[in-house]
C-alpha cells in the first residue's frame, strides 16, 4: 500500500499526491 500513490497519510513523507494528513 503506497500511501504516496494513494495520497494517504504521510506526514513523515510529505510527498505523494497531496498526501499530507489523511
Swiss-Prot record:
Q: Which cysteines are joined by disulfide bonds?
A: none
Indicate where this protein is primarily found. mitochondrion
Bound how, and how many: what does the cofactor note say? Binds 1 FAD per subunit.
| Key words, A-Z | Electron transport, FAD, Flavoprotein, Mitochondrion, Respiratory chain, Transport
Query: Which cofactor does the UniProt annotation name?
Result: FAD
> Mind telling me which GO cellular component terms the entry cites?
mitochondrial matrix
Where, subcellularly, is it found?
Mitochondrion matrix
Region of interest: Disordered? 1-22
Q: How is the quaternary structure described?
A: Complex I is composed of about 45 different subunits.
Family in the record:
Belongs to the complex I NDUFA9 subunit family.
Q: Could you tell me what this protein does?
A: Accessory subunit of the mitochondrial membrane respiratory chain NADH dehydrogenase (Complex I), that is believed not to be involved in catalysis. Complex I functions in the transfer of electrons from NADH to the respiratory chain. The immediate electron acceptor for the enzyme is believed to be ubiquinone.
What name has this protein been given in UniProt?
A: NADH dehydrogenase [ubiquinone] 1 alpha subcomplex subunit 9
Source organism lineage? Eukaryota, Viridiplantae, Streptophyta, Embryophyta, Tracheophyta
Amino acid at each position: 500500500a503506497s500511501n504516496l500513490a494513494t495520497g494517504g497519510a504521510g506526514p513523515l513523507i510529505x510527498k505523494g499526491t497531496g498526501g499530507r494528513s489523511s
